[in-house]
Each structure stands twice: as structure tokens, then as C-alpha cells.
């Protein structure tokens, strides 16, 4: 169950960063987008208010959880789904992204550093 909960957290976290990256490329203000995400009932979630918002306010912000730990849990979910022959394209892609971040930035980095996949090129 822990791995499944962390998979939800991991997918919501990278989805928020991807949305912010696309909006930034479109010319939208990061703070305005973030406030809209927090206020909107359909996208209110813990990763946005407890991780993304503090990270955008202070790029030195950390959550205290290593990137490698979240990457491992997401891989467990993707591997479990594959072993059970479940259709799980989101878990597969989410696992690939977290594994890529782990390889690029190092597993000891904070999980919030996954944002660098989007913001180093935006």
C-alpha cells in the first residue's frame, strides 16, 4: 500500500510540474497558475500545496525524502502491474521519468528535484 500511495504522490507531483512548465512556455505567470491550481477543486492536492508551492517560492526547498526512495516505490508499482498483466501506462511512464531523474541528478537528491526535468529546459 505504501508503494501505491507514493505512486499517486509521484504522479501528481510530476503532473503539476509539467502543467507549470507548459503554462510558463505559454507565457503564464507561475504564481498565478499555482494559486489557480490550489483554489480549483479539481486539482487541489497535497503535492501542489505542500511541495510545488514551497519549491517555487524557494528553489532551495526540500521535502526530506530522497528521490531514489520515490523512484523505487514507483518502479515497484510499475513492475507489480506488469507482473499481474495490468494495463498501467501511467505507472510505466511515471516510473521511466522518476528513474531518469534519479540517473540524471542522483538518488540522494530530494524528490522535489524531479522538477529539474521540466524547468532546466524551459
Listing of model-derived features with the role each one plays in the protein:
Residues 1-122:
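Helical "substrate-binding/catalytic lid" subdomain
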Amino acid at each position: 500500500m505504501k508503494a501505491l500511495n507514493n505512486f499517486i504522490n509521484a504522479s501528481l507531483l510530476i503532473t503539476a510540474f509539467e502543467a507549470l512548465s507548459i503554462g510558463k512556455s505559454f507565457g503564464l505567470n507561475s504564481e498565478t497558475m499555482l494559486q489557480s491550481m490550489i483554489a480549483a477543486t479539481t486539482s487541489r492536492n497535497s503535492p501542489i500545496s505542500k511541495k510545488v508551492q514551497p519549491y517555487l517560492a524557494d528553489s532551495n526547498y526540500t521535502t526530506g525524502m530522497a528521490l531514489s526512495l520515490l523512484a523505487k516505490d514507483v518502479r515497484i508499482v510499475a513492475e507489480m502491474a506488469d507482473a499481474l498483466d495490468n494495463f498501467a501506462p501511467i505507472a510505466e511512464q511515471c516510473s521511466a521519468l522518476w528513474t531518469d531523474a534519479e540517473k540524471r541528478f542522483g538518488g540522494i537528491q530530494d524528490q522535489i528535484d524531479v522538477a529539474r526535468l521540466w524547468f532546466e529546459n524551459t
